[in-house]
Structures are given as structure tokens and as C-alpha cells.
């Protein structure tokens, strides 16, 4: 049996720069079909206009609604082949700037999505007055949260709060979309050690590596596997996409 955990170990020894460039090109090639897609109404609300973080945000993102729509289409182009695919309906995205702890989080449901972005995090990210660094971080965080709005979810295994596999898939895919679109600082942002069950960047870099080295459609197929492998599991999805000779255990 080919063991995916051995492939993952090899991944940790390989530089990821070429990986990110390759995946970004594939997403760019697929982007045009999403230009007219209805991403849902974008409602931007600044709940902390008195903060320095708010002032900084408006300077780097002068048209938040258009910017959010652009990044939403990037997410869609990464997760799906075309608007004809089975895509969760998103009617509205209420995006807020808030003077609270944390970084950013997605909430809501049934097509009404909420996302907050912390002005405190903006201020911390701008501590060195590095506009480019803050813009890079803001885009990366947004890609992650928008993925939660449009991604498919595992079926037959519980929920985000009750099942670790469900959680690892959801957070791993969100960071995979961020990795795939150059939203992290290349190999420097890749965690050392760990495995796919750690979710977030550890899983995200692994999923993108599988796309680059095993199947160029891996991210889209992995997302779609939640509809085709029920009850869903990492091992079942890997076999479904790459073949029965592969195992993740």
C-alpha cells in the first residue's frame, strides 16, 4: 500500500515555492468563468471607526465591497470547476470591522454569512508601518474566512463542533485555499511536523502538495468528495480521488 503519511513526510522536505506558483496559475486560468457569478450581496460595516485599525484598513482597502467580491471569486475558482457545480448558496456576506480580540471569524448560516475582522489585529500587523505586509495579511485572512462561506462540508459524521475529522477538513481546506493563492509567506509559513488532523496550515500545505504532486484537480475533487463519500473520511476521500492503493492511515 502507498502510505500518504510517508508522502506527507516527503512533503516536509520539499520547498513549496514552485507549488504555490503552479497552483496560482491554475486558479488564474479558471478565474474568467466566475466574473459574472453572483457571490451574494456584500454588506461592509465599520463598527470601530474611532480606532487606528479602522483608519489603516480604509487606507489599504478603499473599496471593501469590491475587494471582498474579488477575493470571493478567487476562492470559488479554487474550490470549483464552474458555476454549474454544486455550490452552497450565499445570499449575503455581512463583513464588519470590530474592536475586539482575535483575528477574524466566519459565522451565520443558511446563506447569510457574517465575517468580522479585528481592528486590534490590524494595528498589530501594521506595527512596523509595513503597508505591503498588512495588505498581504488582510488578503490571506479574508481568503480563509471566505472559504468557509463557499466550501462544502463532510456528510454523515457530525458537525464542526462534535467531530475532529470534520473540523480538520474545514480548517485545512480554508488554509489550503490561502496557500494555493499565495496567502502565506511560502515555505517560511509551513509548520514543521504535525499531520493533517491538525487542520489549518499543517493540513493546508499538505493538501496543496497533493494537488501539485498527485492530481492537479485535487483541491476541487477533495471539496466535492464531501458529496460523494458518505459517511466522509480522509481515507475514503483519498481512495476516491487517488485510487484504492492509497491510504492515509
Please identify what each model-predicted range represents:
Residues 55-117:
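Auxiliary, metal-adjacent structural segments of Zn-dependent hydrolase domains
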Residues 36-62, 120:
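Acidic/histidine-rich, surface-exposed loop or edge segments in extracytoplasmic proteins
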Residues 161-203:
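Post-HExxH zinc-binding segment in Zn-dependent metallohydrolases
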Residues 140-153, 171-175:
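Active-site recognition of the HExxH zinc-binding catalytic motif
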Residues 76-96, 157-165, 186-192, 218-225:
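Surface-exposed patches in mature extracellular/periplasmic domains of secreted proteins
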Residues 121-142, 157-166:
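Short pre-active-site segment immediately N-terminal to the catalytic Zn-binding motif
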Amino acid at each position: 500500500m502507498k502510505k500518504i503519511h510517508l508522502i506527507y513526510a516527503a512533503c516536509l522536505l520539499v520547498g513549496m515555492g514552485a507549488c504555490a506558483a503552479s497552483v496560482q496559475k491554475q486558479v488564474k486560468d479558471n478565474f474568467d468563468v466566475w466574473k459574472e457569478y453572483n457571490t451574494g450581496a456584500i454588506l461592509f460595516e465599520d463598527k470601530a471607526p474611532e480606532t487606528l485599525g479602522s483608519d489603516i484598513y480604509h487606507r489599504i482597502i478603499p473599496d471593501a465591497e469590491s475587494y471582498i467580491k474579488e477575493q470571493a471569486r478567487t476562492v470559488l475558482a479554487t474550490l470549483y470547476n464552474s458555476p454549474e457545480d454544486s455550490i452552497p448558496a450565499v445570499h449575503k456576506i455581512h463583513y464588519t470591522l470590530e474592536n475586539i480580540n482575535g483575528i477574524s471569524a466566519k459565522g451565520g448560516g443558511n446563506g447569510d454569512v457574517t465575517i468580522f475582522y479585528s481592528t486590534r489585529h490590524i494595528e498589530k500587523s501594521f506595527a512596523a508601518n509595513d503597508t505591503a505586509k498588512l495588505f498581504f495579511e488582510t488578503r490571506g485572512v479574508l481568503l480563509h474566512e471566505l472559504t468557509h462561506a463557499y466550501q462544502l462540508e463532510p456528510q454523515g459524521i457530525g458537525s464542526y463542533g462534535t467531530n475532529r475529522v470534520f473540523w480538520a477538513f474545514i480548517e485545512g481546506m480554508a488554509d489550503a485555499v490561502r496557500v494555493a493563492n499565495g496567502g502565506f509567506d511560502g515555505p517560511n509559513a509551513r509548520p514543521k511536523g504535525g499531520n493533517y488532523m491538525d487542520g489549518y496550515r499543517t493540513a493546508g500545505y499538505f493538501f496543496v502538495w497533493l494537488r501539485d504532486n498527485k492530481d492537479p484537480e485535487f483541491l476541487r475533487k477533495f471539496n466535492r468528495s464531501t458529496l460523494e463519500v458518505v459517511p466522509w473520511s480522509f481515507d475514503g476521500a483519498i481512495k476516491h480521488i487517488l485510487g484504492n492503493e492509497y491510504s492515509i492511515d
